[in-house]
């Protein structure tokens, strides 16, 4: 992590802004591109109006993400900006995009963002650039410059890129390439650098975090990595995208034994019924769901469980959906995200028969969310009358502190909203941990009062 180059004085220097669409893995790519351009002397900022060049880092996971990406591209080309399209849409449509939107100046693939400065130089010379590798192979390490918003106290740390699985609904392996892990040494160096810069929470990400190390160490090595990360002086380390098969006894023990790895388990299970999971090309999962969830709850009573689900997958019958509802009632996840199946060309699910009508899929999603809201509200209410540790991230217009306890991941979960008994300057609390007494809870957020700064 580094701060922007403050020594750039040349008023003729090219101003570059970024527009980001998609997941946190895409965000890390954006931060690396910003760092690389900053290192080369470009004026990198957030002011899209003043920028001569706009890099749109796109998402192509589902149709709605592509639509949002295209809207942004056209918005900036219509404004006369020089637009560089990076990320998953560039990878996905490397032949079509430049033909369909000739105003685009360059494409940069998911395995080519390290070349952004060279691409920029060519664009400034008037070239139309297509810098998209057929198969992405690159993964950035701690040596690649990276700009992280200095107003934030949370950073994502990518431990691996790509995926070797072939889930029927997912196009990510085609967009991100095969799995390639960073070494433990490289990850520890970056984590230490982040901690030294004042980052309070590091979130480990990859496509399948529990598969970390399989490609370079010959076996999944997340437990070994967590043991080393527990020595880094950062208060919270959170793990996203853990799969059931990788949650071994050794991994769970690493969670238990660490003081800074929060007991938050993000498990994208997708479904509960064996028939649907088999159609999703995840046949191994159904037999593990129950045992893994029970094991986590038994061994770590304070564990927070999040999952993501897909409804409306081809062939999902009412009996399959009712099985999923029973599964949710039984296991009472703290947080649930629900997605309606999106048929993606290039995936095996695209040609599956027996598609579920959209109105049924919509109703199933609404049904799950209604059930989950009641579950989440009851679980949140258990915190009323207790004291929790909260990372304060901002102050509202009403002079309330807004932050998170370890029970909430940024962006996808709720917040802890705290009142204070006196007016304060932002720097008194923001970026710090406080102890808070929880007085009220709804289905999304916790509310309380600050007791003291930790």
Swiss-Prot record:
Residues 14-125 form the MTTase N-terminal domain. It holds the Pfam family TRAM_2. GO terms for biological process: tRNA modification. One of its GO terms (cellular component) is cytosol. It is found in: Cytoplasm. It comes from the Bacteria. Gene3D superfamilies: Methylthiotransferase, N-terminal domain, Nucleic acid-binding proteins, tm_1862 like domain. It is an enzyme of class 2 (transferase). Its EC number is 2.8.4.4. Binds 2 [4Fe-4S] clusters. One cluster is coordinated with 3 cysteines and an exchangeable S-adenosyl-L-methionine. GO terms for molecular function: 4 iron, 4 sulfur cluster binding; aspartic acid methylthiotransferase activity; metal ion binding; protein methylthiotransferase activity. SMART domains: Elp3 (SM00729). It catalyses: L-aspartate(89)-[ribosomal protein uS12]-hydrogen + (sulfur carrier)-SH + AH2 + 2 S-adenosyl-L-methionine = 3-methylsulfanyl-L-aspartate(89)-[ribosomal protein uS12]-hydrogen + (sulfur carrier)-H + 5'-deoxyadenosine + L-methionine + A + S-adenosyl-L-homocysteine + 2 H(+). Residues 381-452 form the TRAM domain. Its cofactor is [4Fe-4S] cluster. Keywords: 4Fe-4S, Cytoplasm, Iron, Iron-sulfur, Metal-binding, S-adenosyl-L-methionine, Transferase. [4Fe-4S] cluster 2 binds at residues 163, 167, 170. Residues 149-378 form the Radical SAM core domain. Belongs to the methylthiotransferase family. RimO subfamily. Catalyzes the methylthiolation of an aspartic acid residue of ribosomal protein uS12. This is Ribosomal protein uS12 methylthiotransferase RimO.
